[in-house]
Amino acid sequence: MKKVLFLLTALLLVLTACSTARQKLSPQGNVNLKTADVYYSQENVDQAEIYYLKVLEDNPDHVIALRRLGDISLFKAEYFTAREVEFYEDAFEYYSKAISVTENFPELTNQDRIDLRDMRKRKERAWARIYMAAEKEKEAGNTQKAKEIFELAHKLEPDRPEPMIQLKNIYLVDIKDEVKAEQILKQLLQKDPDKLEYLLEMGTFYYNKGNYAEAVKYFDHARVQNPTNVDNLMNISACYYELKDYEKAMIATKTALEIEPNNLDLLENARSIADQMNDLDQSIEYLKRILDIRPNEDTYSILAAHLMQKQDWQQLIKYAEEWYNWDTTNKIAVEYIIWAAQQSGNRLLATKYSEIKNKMP
């Protein structure tokens, strides 16, 4: 941590000299700045903080003092963990102001740009640590404390979706207040109606409540923002499936399969939808595709039943034999082969598998 805090100490004189033309200080202000720099270089953060604050009294926009106070606040947050959120908030505020002041300099130098990159990284770090502190409190079961810290994280970065989504979850899961959870999501969407994360959250909220017609509106809107999001296409399909609009459910699933043709969840969904549509041919095709990727007894069993229903004896023989070769102890597969062979007039094959069946336990 000392390295983080004092890495730039050697540059203090250079930075101070560069800033004087832009950021005037009174004679006493200059004395306070030099005194603060000395204490800072000696790693006496408490005294350095006192004198950097005095510099800000003389010039509230003094970038060097703001940056150093941000660094000191980061240092304190890591060493005084009981007050880490307080110190990370201070660091965030100091860096925010220093960044704002620097960005408004009449002409940015290369050093200014380097400083801005560094300050933005540190500001982001401070915010991330606040968010992580809230997550820790939530995991520990300290709901109220977590709520307060997530609210702070949202106040500091109102455009970041994560804190408000976490607050929604707290109200929904921990506090059991669906009305407040819905209110939070509506507020977020009112502010940014096209934000993908908010649309997905709102759709999920209504889906979990069983309001599939409302849920699909938000998932469809999210699809406009990201047409190739497979998870969202599955959401849309699931909504239409629950609404018994199987044609639309199949359209969404097929679109997703164009993106991920070997996605087993999608193939299973497509097969299930085809069954609901009484479309035996489509169901059979999806079952075959599933078996090409992951042979399993349930899929073989369903496919065999479908092929038997269609009286497609040659295909039934093919897949029942494949089933038997995959599991030579499976008597049902053998019986399907025998039946299909008999129906298709293949006596030799029927005899062969009848003998195999007779030898089975």
Say what each PLM segment does.
Residues 2, 18-114, 122-128, 132, ...:
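N-terminal leader/linker segments that initiate helical-solenoid repeat arrays
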Residues 28-30, 63-64, 106, 127, ...:
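Helix-start (N-cap) detector for alpha-helical repeat units in TPR-like alpha-solenoids
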Residues 55, 98, 152-153, 187-188, ...:
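Canonical positions in the second alpha-helix
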Residues 58, 101, 105-108, 156, ...:
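Structural marker of alpha-solenoid helical repeat scaffolds
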Residues 68, 111, 122, 132, ...:
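Canonical tetratricopeptide repeat
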